[in-house]
Amino acid sequence: MSVWICLVFASLLSCAGQLCQKQATRPSRRGRRSRHILFWLGMALLCLGCGMLLWLSVLQSIPVSIAYPMLSLNFVWVTLAGWGIWHEPVARRHWLGVGLIVVGIVILGTSV
């Protein structure tokens, strides 16, 4: 698998882990709160663990000075997911910041 694909998947898994943590904080049915929290935190750990393993393979191939800023994709994924899944409001300035992050990632990615 391409190192760049691994990097994107590592970022997506990290984002998924964050989203599972958010879901663990959401209300659940009475009497099922503990199961709800354990399920979502377990999923978070699974996603974050798999993301870390992919991240280690990325670091074997790409200098950390290039790879680490690419994790800024997490801000993009989390913003899109919060907006799309939980209908969280996103201000114009926030969207502008997301756009600038994407531009920065493209600039870094094409400099390798």
UniProtKB/Swiss-Prot annotation:
One of its GO terms (cellular component) is plasma membrane. Belongs to the ArnE family. One of its GO terms (molecular function) is carbohydrate derivative transmembrane transporter activity. Heterodimer of ArnE and ArnF. It is found in: Cell inner membrane. Pathway: Bacterial outer membrane biogenesis; lipopolysaccharide biosynthesis. Translocates 4-amino-4-deoxy-L-arabinose-phosphoundecaprenol (alpha-L-Ara4N-phosphoundecaprenol) from the cytoplasmic to the periplasmic side of the inner membrane. Residues 35-110 form the EamA domain. This is Probable 4-amino-4-deoxy-L-arabinose-phosphoundecaprenol flippase subunit ArnE. The chain crosses the membrane at residues 37-57, 66-86, 89-109. It comes from Klebsiella pneumoniae (strain 342).
